[in-house]
C-alpha cells in the first residue's frame, strides 16, 4: 500500500502524516470465525520488524467482515500487545456515520491517529456534496485536531470515488486532518 500525502494551505501535512510503506495485514480467523489475536499480533510484529507499517482492517484485511466493536477491540488489543500505534492505519470506514465516528474515536483513544476511511458505499451515485457532508460530519463529531484521515479511493469495490474537487474542498476546510489518500482506483 502506498499513500499520497496532501499539502494544505502551505502547511506540509507530510511532516504530520504516516511515512513509508504500509502493508495490508491479513486478518487470521479461527474456525469459529473469531479473530486469532495471537497470530494477528505476531504478523503485525513481523511486519514492523521488517520496517513496514500496518494497514489493518482494509480490503485485504476483511475489515468489513468485522463489526465496528471487533475492530475497536482489536486496535486496543494490538496496542496493549506493544504494537506501535504510530505505525498503524486502521480502516474505520463504513456506511453508518455514528459507527465510523465511534470506531475512529476508539482508535484515537488507543493512540492511533492515522485512519483509512472508505466513503459510505452502500448507496451508489453519492454526490461530492454528500461525501463532503459525510466527511465533514465525521471530522466535526470526532473533534480531535490530531486525527489524520486518509481517504480510501477504491471505486472498483466501493463504486464511489473521490474527485479532485472534493479532496480540494476538504483540504481547504480541514487542512492537515485530511492527511492523504490511498488510491486503489486501478487506472
Q: Can you say where each PLM-predicted feature lies in the sequence?
A:
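Active-site beta->alpha loop and helix N-cap motifs at the rims of alpha/beta catalytic domains
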Residues: 2-161, 178
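Beta/alpha (TIM)-barrel catalytic core signal, keyed to glycine-rich beta->alpha loops juxtaposed to Asp/Glu
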Residues: 159-187
